[in-house]
């Protein structure tokens, strides 16, 4: 409640609380209302509405922008779970449009073509919670200082190769653990190295975790991938091309949801990994020229 007794909306506490509600779940990319219904039926906690999944964006090239409002509204109408949508890095007007459309979360995404190579969106100006990607702790803290309510380790979207997701999750976790052993004067140096506000760095050092929910993304294509990322410290999973670019998407979606819930139970993981058909063929991250890697977008 605010001082006048009205419900608090758009505050950091409210927005972070909305992101916390998704913990332990799977968020799936969908391009049609039918896919959204499949995702909801499989147990997804939210869907990401976009016109092309990352694998298609990578294959087709060109400039990728915010999805058509009619398409987004069609998906909002098709499901009862929260709906996210992506905007280009720095494109605050796309974010204004999505907020007006009534999406539940906005993803300032490196998967789309950046609109601004120097500035990210000032997310404090919005009542809708934002999700942002990060490859390391400094990047995560900078996004949080701009108002992000959820961080996802980036991985390399649209590849089906989970190696970058593990690299980024381990980097964030390792840097957090390093902070927890530092003295106060060392934290000032760390804040300078991380290019992040000292207050946030000190908060992470005290808590041993980020002050917002940490999901993982990029290259997750199997139940085992999802479970591994959860064991590495993720609090939930984004799955993009890995479901609807694979065989038997309904079964694969449900299996990934179950693997995310029972990530530390090998018996369950073995059971849900059976009979899923062929996983997406994908592409090895090492085969992608550095200049074409999506994870490097942002700063």
Swiss-Prot record:
SUPFAM superfamilies in the record, alphabetically? Answer: Ribulose-phoshate binding barrel
Q: Which residues bind D-glyceraldehyde 3-phosphate?
A: 170
Q: Which UniProt keywords apply?
A: Isopeptide bond, Lyase, Pyridoxal phosphate, Schiff base, Ubl conjugation
Q: Locate the active site.
A: 86
Q: Name the domain of life this protein comes from.
A: Bacteria
Asked whether the keyword Kinase is assigned, the reply is no
An individual GO BP term: pyridoxal phosphate biosynthetic process
- Positions bound to D-ribose 5-phosphate: 29, 158, 219, 240-241
- Which Gene Ontology molecular-function terms are recorded? amine-lyase activity; pyridoxal 5'-phosphate synthase (glutamine hydrolysing) activity
> Which pathway?
Cofactor biosynthesis; pyridoxal 5'-phosphate biosynthesis
Q: What top-tier enzyme class does this entry carry?
A: lyase
Q: What family name appears in the similarity comment?
A: Belongs to the PdxS/SNZ family.
Q: What is this protein called?
A: Pyridoxal 5'-phosphate synthase subunit PdxS
Taxonomic source organism:
Mycobacterium tuberculosis (strain ATCC 25618 / H37Rv)
Q: Which gene encodes it?
A: pdxS
């Amino acid at each position: 409640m605010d001082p006048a007794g009205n419900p608090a909306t758009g505050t950091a506490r409210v927005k972070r609380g909305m992101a916390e509600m998704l913990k332990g779940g799977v968020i799936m990319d969908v391009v049609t209302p039918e896919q959204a219904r499949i995702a909801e039926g499989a147990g997804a906690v939210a869907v990401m509405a976009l016109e092309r999944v990352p694998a298609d964006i990578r294959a087709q090239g060109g400039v990728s922008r915010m999805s058509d409002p009619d398409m987004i509204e069609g998906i909002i109408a098709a499901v009862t779970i929260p709906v996210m949508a992506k905007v280009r890095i720095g494109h605050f007007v796309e974010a204004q449009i999505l907020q007006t459309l009534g999406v539940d979360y906005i993803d300032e995404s490196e998967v789309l073509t950046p609109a601004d190579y120097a500035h990210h969106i000032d997310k404090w100006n919005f009542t809708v919670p934002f999700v942002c990607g990060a490859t390391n702790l400094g990047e995560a803290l900078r996004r949080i200082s701009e108002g992000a309510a959820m961080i996802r380790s980036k991985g390399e979207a649209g590849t089906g190769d989970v190696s970058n997701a593990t690299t980024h999750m381990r980097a964030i976790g390792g840097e957090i653990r390093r902070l927890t052993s530092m003295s106060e004067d060392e934290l000032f140096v760390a804040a300078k190295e991380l290019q992040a506000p000292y207050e946030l760095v000190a908060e992470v050092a005290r808590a041993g975790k980020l002050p917002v929910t940490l999901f993982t993304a990029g290259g997750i294509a199997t139940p085992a991938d999802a479970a591994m990322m959860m064991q590495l410290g993720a609090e939930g999973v984004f799955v993009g091309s890995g479901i609807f670019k694979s065989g038997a998407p309904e079964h694969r979606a449900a299996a990934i949801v179950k693997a995310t819930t029972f990530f530390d139970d090998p018996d369950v993981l073995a059971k849900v990994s059976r009979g899923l058909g062929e996983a997406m063929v994908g592409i090895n991250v090492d085969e992608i020229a550095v200049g074409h890697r999506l994870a490097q977008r942002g700063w």
